[in-house]
């Protein structure tokens, strides 16, 4: 993989990771256009540059992640409740993460096989686009933006759909899950960003470990520049993408993303029917 190819893939990652449009589908198209061979390192690279995207969330929402005020309702209720309230966001993220950890571990081999099918990605991308045309009507936005522990768990269950249906988009699944729980578009999107941090960090570390087992430390030394550049570019682009997405989603809803998904999914299907070789 060249530096230029790494930069292009990182731009695609940064633009699509937090939008409900399937970063996997876009990576397939980008790799196909550039003629990037789907080696074990390339597959690892597309996961490991998620670390840059994770950092963009931590930077943009640093006050939410790294400030630990006691909730007013917990003041004077004892040290236990005050402690729990300080880390309320972390407890909710932990609860939301549990379903994906359990199901991902139990069905890891099956998930890997599904993820390796470009047809599955393309069809799910296309059908998910049709569904998104109706999301705003199915789950009317609410001003009740508070996320409770049960709501966090349900959103975590929705995240599992993206694990078993590559091409669905983790962002789409969790945001729709939040709206189904009567959260506002903004609250649902922001919790989706927050949940991406432990989810994607876990996936990145797991992929790095597997790559290490396969090629040892030398494979990281050999591709250090590509990995570093990829993460920096993904970080910068994701910063802009998140800011754009929050404003656009709050104002216009999901329909535009639905049409876009249909277009991209349809393009993948046409390319494969035309005999173009594509790989995840």
From Swiss-Prot:
Enzyme class, spelled out: hydrolase
Organism: Porphyromonas gingivalis (strain ATCC BAA-308 / W83)
Listed NCBIfam families: PRK00281.1-4, undec_PP_bacA
Biological role: Catalyzes the dephosphorylation of undecaprenyl diphosphate (UPP). Confers resistance to bacitracin.
EC code: 3.6.1.27
Keywords: Antibiotic resistance, Cell inner membrane, Cell membrane, Cell shape, Cell wall biogenesis/degradation, Hydrolase, Membrane, Peptidoglycan synthesis, Transmembrane, Transmembrane helix
Membrane topology field: Multi-pass membrane protein
Subcellular location(s) of the protein: Cell inner membrane
Family: Belongs to the UppP family.
Single GO MF annotation: undecaprenyl-diphosphatase activity
Protein name per its UniProtKB record: Undecaprenyl-diphosphatase
Sequence intervals crossing the membrane: 1-21, 41-61, 87-107, 115-135, 147-167, 186-206, 226-246, 260-280
